[in-house]
Amino acid sequence: VISMHQVGFTNAGASLGTALTSGHASLLKRYTQEVLLLYDSDDAGVRAALRAIPILREAGVSSRVVNLKPHKDPDEFIKALGAEEFEKRLEQAMDSFMFRVHMAEREFPMEEPQGQNRFFERCAQMLLELSDELERNLYIEAIVKDYRNSGISVENLKKRVGALAMKGTPAEQRIQPKPVGAGQQLSLIHISEPTRLQLIS
């Protein structure tokens, strides 16, 4: 956070010692419409981001995820590449739903038909979480675009979502991000636009 302030990202803060909560998300909602997540680029940081995304969404705050690799955190990134490159990474932040999709991909052997099938089943489960039909259809198209080499089509994915909706998805099958320990650090950044906020660690 200090490093960010020093290079001009002056609306930065950190929860320091606790994971993001619904209370934090409600507070953020008072000041911004969008949050950028900049957790550490290691596995713990990924889990923290996955946990934060639905909490923010529930509070009505949209989110995107910033890729800091090959550096671990904003401090390392800024020291190595500077504020201008850091700003570019912020601008390239990934939509949080698609971030969840790409992280889910890691769990399946995508070189095998069975792995691909299970992955798209997971995608369908996540799509069912979206109550707005237009939003759901837009993400279906985005998934198909990103994974067109796997042979998935908009029609096929819509059918999979529809089939799950008809029979209902058991609670134990729904996606639940792994919990983040209480020691996970969270940081917040607010860029110049008053309607956009960003989260880092």
Over which residues does each language-model region extend?
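Alpha-helix C-terminal capping segments
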Residues: I2-T10, Y31
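Short hydrophobic/aromatic-enriched beta-strand-loop microsegments
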Residues: T10-G17
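A charged alpha-helical hairpin associated with nucleic-acid processing machineries
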Residues: A19-V35, Y39-L188, S192, R196
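Cationic, low-complexity basic patches in intrinsically disordered or flexible, solvent-exposed regions
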Residues: L199
